[in-house]
Amino acid sequence: MDLNTKNNNKKVFEIIFENNVLRIEIGEISRQANGSVMLFYKDTVILSVAVCGDKKNSLNFLPLTVNYQEKLYAAGKIPGGFLRREGKPSDQEILCSRLIDRTIRPLFSKNFKNEVQLINMVLSSDPDGNNENIALLGSSLALLISDIPFFEPVSSVCVGKIGDNLIINPTLSQRENSSFFLILAGTKDSLNMVEMSSKEISENNFLESIKFGHEIIKKLCLFQTEIANQIGKTKIKIPLHNVNNLLEVEIKDKYFSEIEMILKNKCNVNNVKKSDILKKLKENVLENYKEKFLNNKKDNFNLLDLENQKLYLNEVEIIFDFLVRTIIRETILKENIRPDGRNSSEIRSITSRIDILPRTHGSALFTRGGTQSLAIVTLGTLRESKIIDDLSDEVDKRFMLHYNFPAFAVGSVGRYLAPSRREIGHGMLAEKALECVLPSENDFPYSIRVVSEILDSNGSSSQATICASSMALMSAGVPLKSLVAGVAMGLIVDDIDKINHYTILSDIEGLEDYQGDIDFKIAGTKVGITALQLDIKIKGITLEIFEKVLEQAKKDRIKILNEMEKVINKSRNEVSKYAPKVKMILIKPEKIRDIIGSGGKIINQIIEKHDNVKIDIMQDGKIYIMHQNMEIVDLTVTYIQNFLKKIKVENVYEVKILRFVKDKMDKTFGAIAEIFPGIEGFIHISKLENYKVDKVEDVLKIGQIILVKCIKINERGQIDLSKKDVFK
């Protein structure tokens, strides 16, 4: 609905979206950008801006950059740290940026190479506003109304399920009770991007939620089209890519047979990946064409400026890549033979080992074909949980999975800096896949960190991470419900505009990922799916294809799990001897201050008395005691429990004599007695008998059990006892 406004340049549009008004304002803010929109949903306000560079570049891909920025003022917060301003993007910001990028990128024309930036600034945030969906819609609409050649609207929704009811855009509280959380994006006709974390959901229930969410997406896409038809700018014309036919024929005649021989050879040469062989061949081809023109004065190559020389060599590279792509795809579609010789449903060979690293708390090495993940588990106290301080309330995150992809994993030289967006995204996917099989905090009161080191990579490294990590967790004694395996599925279609024939690929490798049409990562147990992520490189796929991919992936997942179970099929009964031992006790919240004491004196005394044991006290009365030695943990637990058994003045207790106390003249003047394990009191020599005692040892013996009365407890908690006053 278009609403009239006093500002002639400002256009306002509204739609009812899940019982709330989604309002869009255009024309007042960021007017110098190619396209900009302000979106209002509940209390969330997001500014989405699209900007395009003027010049086409010589790259073989679209230089698209997506930034999703959560300004902390949007939630009424001042940033922490010394500078008190926003710094590097948070994990959540990176994940949302990747989500928008993966959804929108496939919808651009392959011939459009201008630099494009999409900026999404969260200016006001409603905790239940589902900001990622609003930002994606804003990015799509900003592109649609701009002069940037983007023509197909895309929208997204979140779907949850509580009981038998499917819910669109569940609130934070609903997410906690939902059996899954799905983010779905697509056009009015097909799906573009899917992400989900779930509690072992079945394939049928997942497909049901996909269909349910796509109906809402269709309405939002139609809404965007109506706006673009009213106020959209004239689009920049995309220059047609005129293929140099003579050059194409020449390269094909020279190199087609050699490329085909490399791709159809079932054996790798000296274990070198075919992608590396093709890369070397392409480098030689480019060098040959460069030398050809440098040595031939009649040609005009030397007369071209540097930029046009790059464009010419880029043309050579495009033709070479097209030949590789054509051979791979036609061989798969027509002969059902993949670059490594497998058929479409075949999984690469799998080997696994556990306990690779002796001093770590748990480790596993998972190898599938040319991809290898080493997963390491570290257990810590709950105070070592990660603190998440973003637009929502501050929370502690006890399970962390970090994915590292060093350059040597693909035989390259690289810089080792902060984790990349890709590393953060892959780590988060693996983390989601494992969360639902982890024990609760009450059953296993540890913080858990898993690190996946990718040591070799030829596709599906994120899924190898899931397999290695679940095995490492079991080896560390973390009581998982079951093993989790992941597999990456691919798709080759005959026509990206109208799919008539297609082949689904199991366990894709690097070449198939690069030259294929989808990368569909699916993780789960034998019961159901725990996480998935779909990246589509074409305009979309139908629900029918989606269903068949899931069916094949389930069979593959079970095969992989069967291989993993040969190495370890259940969690160990105990954690590693090098891992800290922990116990939890529950006390009344009002007793917490008694344990802590004035200025922390009591808790510090307990810690010092018990070999610097770690003690975490929660507001709800849970106390976690952790130490490398289980005996220390047990002693600390007993001490705290006995400490809370209130020693009262005038009460009589049965005690054990522990030791005598002597003065400077080495004469005994009292005894230390144990009231409860960990709780001690002092008996002065004058309080032993009704007559004068010269030596304590004349009346008492070490280890003797006697009755005493508590006669005093001073402000420091020290207890005075009397033997002679027991019957008074």
UniProtKB/Swiss-Prot annotation:
It holds the Pfam family RNase_PH. It catalyses: RNA(n+1) + phosphate = RNA(n) + a ribonucleoside 5'-diphosphate. SMART domains: KH, S1. One of its GO terms (molecular function) is polyribonucleotide nucleotidyltransferase activity. Mg(2+) binds at D513, D519. Its EC number is 2.7.7.8. Residues 580-640 form the KH domain. One of its GO terms (biological process) is RNA processing. GO terms for cellular component: cytosol. It is found in: Cytoplasm. Its main location: cytoplasm. Keywords: Cytoplasm, Magnesium, Metal-binding, Nucleotidyltransferase, RNA-binding, Transferase. Its cofactor is Mg(2+). It is an enzyme of class 2 (transferase). The keyword Nucleotidyltransferase applies. Residues 650-724 form the S1 motif domain. Involved in mRNA degradation. Catalyzes the phosphorolysis of single-stranded polyribonucleotides processively in the 3'- to 5'-direction. HAMAP family: PNPase. Belongs to the polyribonucleotide nucleotidyltransferase family. This is Polyribonucleotide nucleotidyltransferase. It comes from Phytoplasma mali (strain AT). The gene is pnp.
